[in-house]
């Protein structure tokens, strides 16, 4: 077992312990005190694990972070603080015996620490404050950091990530079950954008496609079914002695009786149709009427799923809750000699009837509540005179019944055919009957349209309630995104702290390259590829759709990153125009000597972004023009690119050393693009220089047209001899 596998095993065991620790917060403190020895023993184990692993994992995240190590840092710190808080609260409860004060202290009800104001400072001193209070705010901040990734100093970026981890420790706590107030289910994340890239947009904008979508990445929904029906499992766990105590056995029997009353799953006409269809198979001669019956039976089953038949009522849920509570009290009397008063028992009397419906019960699965709410909504709809169609027999059911009647009692007389043209022309036109028929058809159409809209609304609200009421756990996307951003800043910090040679080029070398490139023009056919290179350099480490298994163009990755960071449309237009480029160097050669990636004097974030785009454009187009003029193959790579970086221009985004280039003596840092290009040109010339021994002379022959003549063409028939140099 390697270290990563060992860390995964430790994380799994810590999760198991964290769930038990979280449940203790809601338990009756008297019950916890009755087994205080085990609590102390497990608490010592948690303290030992914290002291053993926490600092090492924290250092690991500052070198090479992963979603697992970031989560482990959050989990260990939260469990450590939770154990100390529980121990202090239990000590106070032993003195005052006040359950209300105990729960206020354990659950932190008198204070809210799940808010954070982060002061972000860019590399030129521009500062602004960001307020964080939910997981969506954290994810949105990470997306915005990804958008201005190049404008943040690596130390500042790592400091911000550290504050986010501290907030996640407070917000998530020791348990992965998400608090309802810690997230907004209707706000999408970057992962939602990534999912939409795999499906066609059908001409719809991204914002329209995201409208009404519920995010299941920051918090993942977990479905729990039939919790209330696990009475058999509870009986096995209680044992024979507890079952024979008081009314335990009788209460368990009453709970079993509640859910024995089930409604019929199918309508009567569907059952009759299926009995008739069983007589036919693929080898039978199937009449047309049987084929029609089969088709209508299929559509009838599909339509019945729209209106859900809820197999449980509100009265049954209330009875179930009351009986389970009585069972809990009886078991508590047997084990501890008194009725337990946990947090839920103390706060139950404070809830209204509507609040109880949405808060639910610990004895009933959330899916039951969702079915109940949906059923009550549809029942209320049925009582409306406008939508009586819900309670009436629909056309599919009527057609199935008529087909069954025709099969059982076939008619001997043929149905009258359609009247011929002459008879139709001779018939008297009944205007009143036609008006009534058209009015009925119009009302039917309006009713169906309204019905479909109402049912679509019910389904949408059902999805929302399902997300809110069901159990949600914290997803791993927030930890993955945070680890990617941290690794980018860590890599930049390594290059910032590294010892590199300083370029020895002067202003004359800068001017030499610039003067050689300025009169030239960039080939027009290179601009599309150069635009993709610029988008690749500007895209933050989080928007890596162009590196995925199904890669997208770099401009799409940049567009999704800008959209989710909520960049204004006019800024996106400025970015697109800047990246388009031009073949004339006088337009984009604007950087002064040793001023590359220098933002001094800029006091606005938007202006800083525009200046950064101009820097990247000048770097990309200058290198491309240099390659075209001098016949080079120099490439620009980011520091987070995989592979060998030697021989390429390395872009670090650091203010002190924005460019690195590997020369013969090692890495050299540059703050000027054209000095770097001169260094590459000089290194190439030095490699091509050959030392000539003393006393050896070479005569250089003047080239002439005879060098191009084939052997069989030297007779002068093709190239006149007068053109040859004698």
Swiss-Prot record:
It is found in: Host nucleus. Keywords: ATP-binding, Host nucleus, Late protein, Metal-binding, Nucleotide-binding, Viral genome packaging, Viral release from host cell, Zinc, Zinc-finger. One of its GO terms (molecular function) is ATP binding. ATP binds at residues 626-633. GO terms for biological process: viral DNA genome packaging. It holds the Pfam family PRTP. A zinc finger (C3H1-type) spans 189-217. The keyword ATP-binding applies. One of its GO terms (cellular component) is host cell nucleus. Its main location: host cell. Transmembrane segments: none annotated. InterPro entries: UL28/UL56. Belongs to the herpesviridae TRM1 protein family. Associates with TRM2 and TRM3 to form the tripartite terminase complex. Interacts with portal protein. Component of the molecular motor that translocates viral genomic DNA in empty capsid during DNA packaging. Forms a tripartite terminase complex together with TRM2 and TRM3 in the host cytoplasm. Once the complex reaches the host nucleus, it interacts with the capsid portal vertex. This portal forms a ring in which genomic DNA is translocated into the capsid. TRM1 carries an endonuclease activity that plays an important role for the cleavage of concatemeric viral DNA into unit length genomes. This is Tripartite terminase subunit 1. It comes from Human herpesvirus 6A (strain Uganda-1102). The gene is TRM1.
């Amino acid at each position: 077992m390697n270290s990563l596998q060992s860390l995964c095993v430790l994380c799994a065991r810590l999760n198991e312990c964290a769930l038990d620790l979280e449940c203790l917060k809601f338990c009756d403190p008297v019950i916890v005190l009755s087994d205080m020895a085990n609590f102390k023993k497990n608490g010592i184990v948690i303290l030992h694990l914290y002291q053993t692993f926490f600092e090492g994992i924290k250092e690991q995240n500052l070198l090479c972070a992963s979603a697992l190590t970031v989560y482990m840092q959050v989990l260990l710190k939260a469990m450590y603080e939770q154990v100390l808080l529980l121990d202090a609260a239990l000590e106070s409860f032993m003195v005052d015996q006040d359950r209300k004060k105990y729960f206020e202290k354990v659950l932190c009800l008198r204070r809210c620490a799940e808010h954070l104001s982060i002061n972000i400072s860019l590399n030129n001193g521009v500062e602004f404050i960001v307020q964080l209070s939910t997981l969506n705010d954290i994810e949105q901040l990470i997306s915005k950091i990804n958008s201005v990734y190049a404008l943040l100093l690596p130390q500042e970026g790592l400091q911000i990530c550290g504050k986010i981890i501290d907030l996640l420790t407070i917000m998530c706590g020791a348990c992965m079950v998400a608090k309802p107030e810690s997230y907004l289910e209707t706000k999408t994340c970057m992962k939602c954008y990534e999912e939409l890239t795999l499906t066609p947009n059908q001409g719809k904008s991204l914002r329209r496609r995201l409208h009404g979508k519920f995010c299941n990445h920051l918090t993942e929904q977990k479905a729990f079914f039939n919790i209330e029906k696990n009475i058999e499992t509870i009986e096995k766990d209680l044992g024979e002695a507890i079952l024979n105590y008081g009314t335990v056995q009788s209460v368990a029997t009453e709970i079993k009786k509640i859910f024995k009353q089930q409604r019929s799953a199918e309508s009567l006409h569907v059952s009759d149709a299926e009995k008739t269809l069983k007589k036919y198979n693929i080898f039978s001669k199937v009449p047309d009427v049987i084929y029609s019956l089969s088709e209508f039976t299929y559509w009838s089953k599909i339509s019945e799923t729209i209106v859900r038949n809820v197999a449980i009522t509100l009265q049954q849920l209330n009875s179930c809750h009351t009986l389970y509570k009585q069972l809990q009290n009886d078991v508590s009397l047997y084990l501890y000699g008194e009725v337990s008063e946990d947090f839920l028992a103390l706060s139950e009397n404070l809830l209204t009837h509507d609040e109880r419906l949405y808060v639910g019960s610990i004895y009933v699965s959330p899916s039951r509540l969702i079915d109940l709410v949906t059923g009550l909504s549809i029942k209320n709809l049925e009582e409306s005179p406008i939508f009586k169609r819900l309670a009436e027999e629909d056309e599919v059911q009527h057609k199935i019944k008529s087909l069954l009647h025709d099969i059982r009692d076939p008619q001997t007389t043929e149905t009258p055919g359609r009247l011929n043209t002459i008879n139709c022309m001779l018939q008297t036109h009944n205007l009143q009957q036609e008006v009534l028929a058209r009015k009925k058809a119009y009302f039917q159409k309006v009713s169906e349209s309204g019905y479909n809209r109402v049912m679509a609304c019910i389904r949408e609200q059902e999805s929302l309630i399902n997300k809110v009421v069901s159990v949600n756990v914290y997803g791993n996307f927030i930890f993955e995104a945070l680890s990617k951003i941290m690794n980018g800043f860590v890599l930049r910090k390594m290059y910032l702290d590294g010892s590199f040679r300083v370029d020895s080029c002067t202003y004359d070398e800068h001017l030499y390259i610039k003067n050689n490139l300025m009169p030239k023009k960039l080939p027009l056919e290179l601009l599309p590829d150069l635009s993709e290179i610029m988008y690749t350099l500007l895209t933050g480490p989080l928007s890596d759709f162009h590196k995925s298994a199904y890669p997208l163009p770099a401009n799409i990755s940049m567009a999704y990153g800008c959209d989710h960071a909520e960049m204004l449309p006019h800024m996106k237009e400025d970015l697109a125009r800047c990246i388009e480029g031009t073949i004339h160097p006088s337009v984009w050669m604007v950087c002064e000597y040793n001023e590359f990636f220098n933002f001094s004097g800029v006091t606005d974030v938007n202006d800083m972004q525009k200046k950064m785009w101009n820097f990247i454009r000048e770097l990309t187009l200058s290198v491309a023009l240099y390659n075209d003029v001098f016949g080079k193959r120099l490439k620009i790579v980011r520091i987070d690119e995989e592979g060998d970086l030697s021989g390429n221009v390395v872009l670090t985004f650091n203010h002190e050393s924005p460019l690195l280039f590997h020369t013969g003596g090692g890495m050299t840092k540059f703050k000027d693009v054209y000095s770097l290009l001169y260094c590459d040109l000089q290194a190439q010339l030095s490699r091509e220089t050959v030392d000539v021994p003393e006393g050896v002379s070479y005569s250089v022959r003047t080239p002439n047209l005879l060098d191009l003549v084939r052997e069989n063409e030297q007779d002068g028939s093709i190239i006149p001899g007068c053109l040859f140099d004698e």
